[in-house]
């Protein structure tokens, strides 16, 4: 059954739109981005491209909140963001519109309308970084932007043993100088899980934590490889 409401009073089109909170899951190739966050120097960033697309769609500046910031050259398989906007659009319309305005190295995998209290950063339970090592005598032209080439022998047994020492809560204060802005509140992070797998010449390291300091994931991998 369709119901149509009729009013003799003039309708305010803005007042007729409700505030919505959209949660988006992104995938992106970070090769040509200077990280997630918008830079004052105007470098190309993921957040910058997202907000440019939203400006095209909604004709106004939209503040985007991310679950975390990725550094230059870091890719994402499931970055979660959210933004609030007064709109009649539904999730699939937002996804379609953003896809038409975004470059090919950013993909919107999913869009949901969530409660107004949802916050991509504060409601994130954990974050997982995947570090991929190509462990053979020669590099890969095809995969060079998606792995770290390491031609020397790696002792996986020792690596897994060293990984256990990082599990649990640790104070990474030694990273504070390199990440002064992000570490000004707390340098304590909880490493929940480290999973190391090898298939053929590929070693994959998944590190799950409640948060990461600047390039801490790289330092952890290097320490485990020593």
Language model region names:
Residues 2-226:
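Structured-RNA-binding interfaces characteristic of tRNA pseudouridine synthases
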């Amino acid at each position: 059954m369709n119901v149509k409401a009729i009013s003799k009073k003039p309708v305010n089109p803005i007042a007729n739109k409700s505030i919505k909170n959209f949660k988006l899951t992104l995938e992106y190739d970070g090769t040509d981005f200077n990280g997630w966050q918008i830079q004052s120097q105007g470098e190309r960033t993921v957040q910058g491209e997202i907000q440019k697309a939203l400006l095209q769609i909604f004709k106004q500046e939209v503040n985007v909140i991310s679950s975390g910031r990725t550094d230059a050259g870091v890719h994402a398989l499931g970055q979660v963001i959210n933004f609030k906007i007064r709109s009649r659009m539904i999730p699939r319309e937002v996804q379609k519109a953003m896809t038409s305005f975004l470059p090919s190295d950013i993909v919107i995998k999913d869009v949901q309308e969530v409660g107004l209290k949802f916050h991509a950063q504060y409601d994130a339970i954990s974050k997982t970084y995947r570090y991929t090592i190509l462990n053979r005598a020669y590099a890969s032209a095809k995969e060079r932007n998606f792995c770290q080439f390491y031609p020397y022998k790696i002792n996986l047994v020792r690596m897994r043993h060293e990984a256990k020492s990082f599990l649990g809560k640790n104070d990474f204060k030694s990273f504070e100088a390199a990440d002064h802005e992000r570490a000004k509140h707390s340098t304590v992070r909880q490493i929940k899980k480290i999973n190391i797998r090898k298939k053929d010449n590929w070693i994959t390291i998944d590190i799950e934590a409640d948060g990461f300091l600047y390039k801490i994931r790289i330092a952890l991998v290097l320490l485990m490889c020593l």
